[in-house]
């Protein structure tokens, strides 16, 4: 079992929503990664998260995730993120669903009084609900991310343009089961990526900073969502303390 914050990868919220990252903050399985000592922000990782065991009520579920990034000169970089979710059945509902998501991207991080990070990527989400049909659905789209920070003050904008990445969200998991795939837990990403208007924009404005070598983290801000049909807002206030660092426990880094 390991903490989600140990993941190095840059995963779009199409992979994991804020609520998924908060409530499902422990991963059960395997994590392995390599981080370059010669190039900053250069790494590759792979993890397996066993999310559910087969039983009378619960599904057998596991997720394979991987990410990598290579940083070039002057802040340019390229990388990828990948997820394969095996969403199998329970004794009461034997249908199996395959759900994949691939996100190659390129970006540029630089400083011009403010710290900037601009990234553009492609999202491809092949998936198949075997209880629905045996045809693969292959929605895709593009995402552009922009981040500006200074002294902890942060402006972040994520713009997605493309097809509905969660086409099974509102479909019932079985003929006699009044539960949709969205309710049953097939999608871990933000539900806004199920947009039917080919657009989703998320803007975050606020304060996000860590103190005492990462022991204390403070985050507060406003989030604005737009999916082509209307706008919604969220307020975020979060204070977190790393107990492991506070009491100097757990594995120590080798020097």
Show which residues each predicted segment covers:
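Surface-exposed coil loops of outer-membrane beta-barrel proteins
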Residues: 1-69, 81-86
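Exposed, low-structure sequence patches enriched in small/polar residues
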Residues: 41-47, 51, 57, 65-72, ...
């Amino acid at each position: 079992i390991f903490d989600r914050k140990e993941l190095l990868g840059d995963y779009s919220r199409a992979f994991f929503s804020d609520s998924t990252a908060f409530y499902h903050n422990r991963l059960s399985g395997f994590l392995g990664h390599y981080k370059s000592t010669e190039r900053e922000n250069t790494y590759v990782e792979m993890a397996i998260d066993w999310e559910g065991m087969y039983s009378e009520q619960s599904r057998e579920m596991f997720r394979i995730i991987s990410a990598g990034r290579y940083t070039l000169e002057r802040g340019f970089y390229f990388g990828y993120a990948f997820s394969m979710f095996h969403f199998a059945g329970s004794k009461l509902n034997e249908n199996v669903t395959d759900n994949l998501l691939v996100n190659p991207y390129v970006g540029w991080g630089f400083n011009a009084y403010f710290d900037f990070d601009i990234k553009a990527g492609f999202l491809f989400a092949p998936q198949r609900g075997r209880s629905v049909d045996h045809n693969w659905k292959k929605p895709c789209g593009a995402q552009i991310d922009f981040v500006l920070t200074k002294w902890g003050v942060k402006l972040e904008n994520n713009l997605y343009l493309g097809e509905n990445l969660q086409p099974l969200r509102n479909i019932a998991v079985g003929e006699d089961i009044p539960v949709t795939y969205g309710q049953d837990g097939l999608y871990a990403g933000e539900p806004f990526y199920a947009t039917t208007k080919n657009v989703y924009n998320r803007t975050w404005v606020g304060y996000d900073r860590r103190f005492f070598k990462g022991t204390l983290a403070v985050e507060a801000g406003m989030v604005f969502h737009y999916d082509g049909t209307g706008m919604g807002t969220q307020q975020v206030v979060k204070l977190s303390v790393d107990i492991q660092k506070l009491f100097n426990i757990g594995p120590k880094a080798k020097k």
